[in-house]
Amino acid sequence: MLEYWDKNFYTMDEFYQDVANGTLPAYAFVEPRSLYNNNDYHPPAPLAPNVPIGGWSDVRAGDLLAHDIYTAVKASATITGSNALNTLLLVTFDEHGNCFDHVAPPTATTPQNPQPEGELNFFFDRLGVRVPTILISAYTEAGSVINRPIHHGAVVRTLCTKYNLAPLTDRDHFAPDLSDAITLDEPRFPSTWPTPIPRIVPPPPPGLERRPLNDLEKTIVGLAIARFSPQPGATAIPPTLGEAQTLLRTLVGDRFKHA
């Protein structure tokens, strides 16, 4: 994705402007904050037992992000371009949150054939534990539930079908698409959609800037150093969140500014 960094990556402020102005691209992907004042739902997991937890996270911040995006899409009413009636909003997760699931993960098409062996003798021939997914569309009946097995490859399959793209792997090539989520011939107007009220998100705790980075945060900072530091070999990963935030702003802050 590096070749598209200066063309296809934008800030959340610009995203909301595009929603309001009806200028969203055909496909937009929102990545939550995963470093400092997180809103990605991901807990700041300890590095090992009895090791202090670095960072800070509050699931209410993730709920607020989902609320703000949904509310912006619901309010978009431009005559041309993107608007609430022609935008499909999909909210999904890459992990199940370590919650128990009584349904055993089913088998799945391997990405390749033959499929090379992965870690722990795994051949990628089975799906993982179920994750929640919310689909919002003016052409989806309120309260609809899809009970058949669908995995993340369905998103890629849907995009490939809609835009006549080649599949990435056998997994997404044989995946079901999301077409059965579109159940209405006439749209439900946004005035009939729910109006959720988000819970108040408290500010980050005092001293957050002095907390250590967890493994995910170290990876994010390390990638930024490797790509954008003029001397990557001489630039160390900072030990605290505050120092990491300052470094990231120095390395990549201006790269989101578009002419």
Task: State where each predicted segment sits.
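N-terminal pro-sequences and low-complexity stem/linker regions of secreted or lumenal proteins
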Residues: 1-259
